[in-house]
Amino acid sequence: QFLLRDAINAAQRMQPGTYRLDTDRSSIYMEMTNSFPTNTEMEAELTFVQQPGSGGGGRRGFGGGNPNFEGVGSVAATGEAASIRMHHSFVQVPDDNYVPRAFDPQAGYGAVTYQDYAVPLGEPMTQRFIRRHRLEKRNPSARMSEAVEPIVYYLDPGTPEPIRSALLDGARWWNQAFEAAGYIDAFQVEMRPDSISSLDARYNVINWVHRSTRGWSTGGSVTDPRTGEIVKGVVTLGSLRIRQDYMIAEGLLSPYENGDETPPELAEWSLARIRQLSAHEVGHTIGLGHNYYNSGAGRISVMDYPHHLVNLNSDGSLDYSEVYDVDIGEWDKVAVNYGYREFPAGTNETEELNRMLEVARGDDILYMSNQDIATTPQADQWANGNDVGVELNRMMDVRAAAMRRFGEKAIQSGAPMATIEETLVPLYLHHRFQVESTASAVGGVEYTYAMRGDGLQPFQRVSAQAQNAAIDALMRTLELSELKIPDHILSLIPPRPPGYGPHREMFPRYTGSAFDAATPAVVAASHTVNFLLEQSRAARLVEQKALDPN
């Protein structure tokens, strides 16, 4: 009964219609049920059945006839019933020899918290510790030392080349950060041998997985809730990400001069992204959160969401020589130093940790995360630069140059001409994330995670001049010349041929089978207007005008 239950309320999320767990059609999945020295793993295959008359839409749960909505029937044989495997883990807590480290919101770590009702009056009941692996020097007094037990991650042997080498390279970047924290080869990445199960809690793993559609890669961990000690890191990398990056490069570069070649720059571009992705998700599993701070020092963290950096040369060609970063970032070194440095006996740890963050602030190396991106132009995701309006204009220039060159060279010989649309979509929306970043300056505020006594400026409003510059840049995205798809592109896109039906990576259309030339403009313009007039942004604008009429 414990295993044959809907522990995560999956039935409530299955659409369209209403689903119910059928225990008579469910069973224990023995292939993923096992026991290891420190953990027991159990899995059940649960079957959910669509209830009669619950609004399935007549297509067995495939979205009620709407091809743009993918319901249960898009991933199951039919939407009438679907089986899901649900996994349960029982993990032994570690020994009591680990020493937790205090949480600081400026340090970039996730926290574990609990209420301690025994603390003296005047001290906070909420205890906060960072999440991190246990790591100790063999020689604590040495400036550089090997670890008593290094942190080792094992890559899924099912990962194919050249992706395998790229993932190994990216994950290994973290050893640079641990070296900066005083360790020698304390962070290692190896291929997982057959003798090690990915379910064994004694080993950190990087899994390579497949999905029916693009989805997030993740970096999770099993953490001791008492101390924040990470017991096991689990990275899950989706195999479709690299395909999307490949297609983005095809749209921007239109690289198929003859149509039958395989331009090496496409793989180089995509593999550079995969190296960064590997480092990013591993970073989560060693305790770190996203860092979206727009630093004057440039790309400071692999914990950012990186947008491909493509520059426009004076002759109109595109420069992608620095499309993604190739090393660990300066912030990443600061964060690992904060979380993992072992101090000699007698050191005032709190003072040393605060000093690390103070030195980093002097170099404009700070931490801002997910909750900040909509409110301040100091932090954004999928963006480059640190002046949001200037960067949006630069990206619009790159987009315009690529659109002028875009054509049949964006697809290979033998591909249906209609499939040009797939490469056109990311090119036409090349600026979409920078629109969000630029809108954050409008009604925006600037702030830090200031602590009393650290001397930081807690809060100020974005200047009127900067807000107006951001609005000007956003208005450019609404100009007809930017929204209109050039005629030389429209003339290349026929209706979809048999076997190449509509799917989620295409623009919506209201023109039957013919390509709809208007809806891309509606999509792009709506994107800008929706972010510009977002409810909380509008409220801040009203407030700012009331507080400062100038």
What are these language model-derived features?
Residues 175-186, 215, 286-293:
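Secondary-structure transition/capping motifs at alpha-helix termini
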Residues 223, 229-237, 275-286, 328-351:
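Extended catalytic-interface subdomain
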Residues 191-210, 272-327:
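The catalytic-center signature of Zn2+-dependent metalloproteases
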Residues 297-550:
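Conserved catalytic/binding loops enriched for acidic/polar residues
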Residues 172-183, 283-284, 308, 432, ...:
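Sec-exported extracytoplasmic/periplasmic mature domains
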Residues 165, 246-247, 313-317:
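Short conserved micro-motifs at the rims of enzyme active sites and ligand-binding pockets
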Residues 1-159, 168, 177, 186, ...:
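Auxiliary tRNA-acceptor-end handling modules of aminoacyl-tRNA synthetases
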Residues 124, 157, 161-169, 268-277, ...:
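Soluble non-cytosolic domains of exported or imported proteins
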